[in-house]
Amino acid sequence: MLDSVGINTCEGGRMLKKLVFLLITMLLVAPSIILAGCSGGVSDIIALVPQKANLVGEINLSQILSDEDFADIYNRPPKENEDPQTLQDVLDVFEDDSGIDLRDFDRGVFFSDTSVSGDDGGYFGVIIEGDFDGEDLLDAIESSMGGELSVDEYKGYDIYSNEDETSAIAFLSPSVFVIGQISPVKDVIQVKEGNREALGGDVMETYNELGDALIKMVSLQAYLGGETLPDSLPGLPIDLSPFADIEKSTLVLDKQGHTIFMETKLHFSNSKSAESAENLVSLAGLLVDMLPVPEEGQNVVPELLDKLDIERDGSLLTISFEITVSEIEDIIESGNAA
């Protein structure tokens, strides 16, 4: 299970991969919560992120899972009899399969140093806070692995790791744990003990400027441009090179009242690249609108594209999307009626 945060070496890695994936990618959003300090001296888990991270994000899972609007969005569409009928049923099934109740987790902060490639093992971790039972969580991990985790003491903390010690989990207090590759797990422990500098600078400043949002993320793109992004798409005359000039990007997903919104801001090194990217995003919307769409989606795609707003101010490109819960329900009903 631990391998899924880093290297997939054992069968048990699949379950932690599912857990981490759910914690950082669920797109249901709701108002964020103001969290009280947790025991063990951890007042805010963002303060445990190491300075070397150039990507950091936050998800408030408890509000996502308890929001009635989003539960209704899942519950409304007709389903097969064998499928989970409600969102709570989905969570129950996941708990039955994995031994992990996602409702025990309140909030997660994920972080990465994107300059460390997968060939070098990568650098990614998630710090999670909630009301969970550590022994039950370890039992679930070991059950999925079919064996025991290795345990090593590090600066007064037990680090539980997979067989090749590439990925690990450590409990920082009764209500906080960190999972990820073993290097960032150790770095978080060092930050907590005052032996390593916590996140600061432009990443932390931008993170704070994003305010209270259910899901938010900031990334410095210094290592994400030309090294990982192709210049074009195979078979299509589309130039992707302007995106290599992104210096910083942010993402916010939130819900206020019954309205959901998403906003992505791309900060380019120059206005020319931002303008080219703006034209490319607009072109992509036109291409999607022209593509053949299955009958059940013919009413959905145009409505969603109409919700997309693209604005540019010099070297800053902003892409936003806003929709109400009732509009989502109408789209679902129109899709079912097609």
Which residue stretches match the model-derived regions?
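Short, Lys/Arg-enriched N-terminal segments with co-localized hydrophobic residues
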Residues: M1-R14
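Bacterial N-terminal signal peptides
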Residues: I24-I33
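C-terminal motif of bacterial Sec signal peptides marking the signal peptidase cleavage site
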Residues: L35-G37
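Bacterial signal peptide processing site
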Residues: S39-G41
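One face of beta-strands
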Residues: L55-G57, F124-G130, E247-L253, H258-L266, ...
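Single conserved position on a long alpha-helix in the C-terminal lobe of the eukaryotic protein kinase
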Residues: G57, I100-G201, T264, I319-E333
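An internal, short helix-loop-strand segment that often contains or flanks glycine-aspartate motifs
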Residues: E68-R103, E148-H258, A274, M290, ...
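A cross-kingdom marker for long, charged
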Residues: D289-A338
